[in-house]
Amino acid sequence: MSLTHYSGLAAAVSMSLILTACGGQTPNSARFQPVFPGTVSRPVLSAQEAGRFTPQHYFAHGGEYAKPVADGWTPTPIDTSRVTAAYVVGPRAGVAGATHTSIQQAVNAALRQHPGQTRVYIKLLPGTYTGTVYVPEGAPPLTLFGAGDRPEQVVVSLALDSMMSPADYRARVNPHGQYQPADPAWYMYNACATKAGATINTTCSAVMWSQSNDFQLKNLTVVNALLDTVDSGTHQAVALRTDGDRVQLENVRLLSRQDTFFVNTSDRQNSYVTDHYSRAYIKDSYIEGDVDYVFGRATAVFDRVRFHTVSSRGSKEAYVFAPDSIPSVKYGFLVINSQLTGDNGYRGAQKAKLGRAWDQGAKQTGYLPGKTANGQLVIRDSTIDSSYDLANPWGAAATTDRPFKGNISPQRDLDDIHFNRLWEYNTQVLLHE
């Protein structure tokens, strides 16, 4: 689909209508706050409705959807100040305590030597580390943390494209035999290296990929270096993919263009699954991209995160979020105390979208109410700059192109399968800057 481009008059009329519906402020205001119930194109929660959309509710249950476990996960800050890491990665072995020069080597060693459930810490000295990092299912709780003063000082980087062939993937990811059959993450690499299709697809395009529970990242940057080296077409290029439960990111930067952060639920065979919870907490971080750059099926809370939409690749469309939550699951993505911004190509243009549902797996059937994924997302207590479409901030669904339809009925069911589940509450929208 393509974005709608209004003439100056039409844009003014649309803005006037949405402002009237959302609080009566005039277009000359510096900002406005959408208010309940909003419009069909921009639905807004009431204070009572918003009461259930908190981290406590999102993280209340783990385990299987059919048999949820009320474990009430409460993430605590990732404290590495007193950690003496047994594994230290640096540009030169033996310098500044570096035990390894490759993050994957350190991960492999940690998994072989610590098969239990005691948390293992891997310290990354300042530098740029070129290559993938794969953490397999069943790994012990693992924390990778940068030792620099800022996350920009520790960078994990590689250029991977969903459209590349398995042969090109093998040459890019494993040119010197970094992955071997006896390695813990060999099966992850091999599943992508031996794909039968012409391309590796999105599922194999991640620079860093963890299938394990209790995985943590702190104070580092992960970048898929494909960035603007490709055209504005379809080039999924995941920086970070997580599939496990109780994942935490703190003071992390994720950089790419299309599909930057894949916060997902899958099985060991790299297949999408619809039977269990995968929870993630992302705090004090920065995520950059252009199309669907935060997407997936996990239950994820983003707290004090800046989402920055960029125009440098020349994409005709821009979407921040693309959740594909199971329709029977009440909680998908929650964005709180955060900022949604754009670069100079978008700021003031009001043409990027906050997001769209991802009707994953429904290309042939179209959206089937109650069967197809129906992405769930709430943006609350956050600021949205002038990069984003004022009257129509949500796009038609990915995969099916299902038109966005918000529920503004006085007696609405927030999980009605005949409507989208993309909401706002207490957002501040900047009209110009």
From Swiss-Prot:
GO molecular function, one term: pectinesterase activity
One Pfam family it belongs to: Pectinesterase
Binding site for substrate: T202, Q236, R356, W358
EC number, as in UniProt: 3.1.1.11
Keyword Signal belongs to the record: yes
Record-level GO cellular component terms: cell outer membrane
Protein's name according to its UniProt entry: Pectinesterase B
